[in-house]
């Protein structure tokens, strides 16, 4: 509404847990919204205003994800009934590539990428680590799964195959 009132069209690309929640219905909650919003100067101003009005933390929209955006993105548009905002999310393939490369372990207060990886592996019916690498190659042609993460991803694939979790 705020963007529309100013005659602005914001392009919002939502990543991470919020994308999994909105587009793939895989989670019930996320603590923040990882997003790249253009134009960013207007978006930051409007996000501060929304945070103030809704009593949200100032960093409720986190644009740190922009450091990890692939040279070739795979995005899809979500239906959205607002003239001031266009929302896109990564495809499942692109999210899998991002999550597999990050492969962050759980920490106190942070659940990491394991549950999201498990969900994506199941959704996409991935059967091998090389299948995961093929998705990575589409978006990050110069990156490979770290050796220490390969065993974890193989274990998650096996869990999904056996129908666990």
Where would I find each of the regions flagged by the language model?
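Compositionally biased terminal segments of proteins
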Residues: 1-165
């Amino acid at each position: 509404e705020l963007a529309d009132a100013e005659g602005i069209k914001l392009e919002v690309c939502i990543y991470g847990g919020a994308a999994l929640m909105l587009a793939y219905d895989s989670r019930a909650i996320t603590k923040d919204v990882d997003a790249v919003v253009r134009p960013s100067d207007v978006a930051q101003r409007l996000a501060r205003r929304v945070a103030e009005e809704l009593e949200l933390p100032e960093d409720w929209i986190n644009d740190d994800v922009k450091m990890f955006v692939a040279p070739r993105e795979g995005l899809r548009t979500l239906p959205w009934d607002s003239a001031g905002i266009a929302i896109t999310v990564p495809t499942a393939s692109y999210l899998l590539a991002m999550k597999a490369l990050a492969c962050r372990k759980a920490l106190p207060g942070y659940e990491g990428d394991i549950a999201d990886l498990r969900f994506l592996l199941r959704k996409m019916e991935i059967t091998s680590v090389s299948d995961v690498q093929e998705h990575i190659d589409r978006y990050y042609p110069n990156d490979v799964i770290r050796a220490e993460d390969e065993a974890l991803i193989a274990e998650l694939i096996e869990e999904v195959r056996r129908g666990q979790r």
